[in-house]
Amino acid sequence: MEIKFTIKQVVAVGIGAALFVVIGMINIPTPVPNTSIQLQYAVQALLSIIFGPIIGLLVGVIGHAIKDSLAGYGLWWTWIIASGLFGLVVGLFRKYVRVINGVFDWKDILIFNLIQLLANALVWGVLAPLGDVVIYQEAAEKVFAQGIVAGIANGVSVAIAGTLLLLAYAGTQTRAGSLKKD
């Protein structure tokens, strides 16, 4: 099976990964060590809805890997993969959010936020900490505390910033049936 990307998709991955890195450098600390409020997941969610699950996955994996490399504390693959999986899961449900058609009303906002909250709970509350325990032999209590705080913080930041980004994007799209002949 050969996967081909359009120029638009390649550019979306590049810009998305770059934004992931730059926005990810803004760290708002939490009381849990090595855990901060991250704002880049709103952009990743936007790109996942617009371009789909593979682009969302690549933005998360590439962006998080570069961010970790630049931060100087090494690559933490369980969390890098979790970032990619967040984009993948959100992108898998893109057909239920009508933003590409210029529609992002209360129903779409609700669906988007249910999807992203479940994705955040899954990847940060379960998969990333479980990976840390299995692969890195980290203390379960510590990494699950980090994961739960990260999941809540990311869920709230995507609910606010991601919703605003999708509202703005939907406003740039032409709604079906909105053009009338004079």
UniProtKB/Swiss-Prot annotation:
Keyword field contains Transmembrane helix: yes
Pfam families, per database record: ECF-ribofla_trS
Major subcellular location class: membrane
Keyword terms: Cell membrane, Membrane, Transmembrane, Transmembrane helix
GO CC annotations on file: plasma membrane
Cell compartment(s), UniProt: Cell membrane
Membrane topology classification: Multi-pass membrane protein
TM region positions: 10-30, 46-66, 73-93, 109-129, 148-168
InterPro entries per record: ECF_substrate-spec-like, UPF0397
Keyword Transcription regulation: no
Family: Belongs to the UPF0397 family.
Database matches in HAMAP family: UPF0397
Protein name per the record: UPF0397 protein SPH_0594
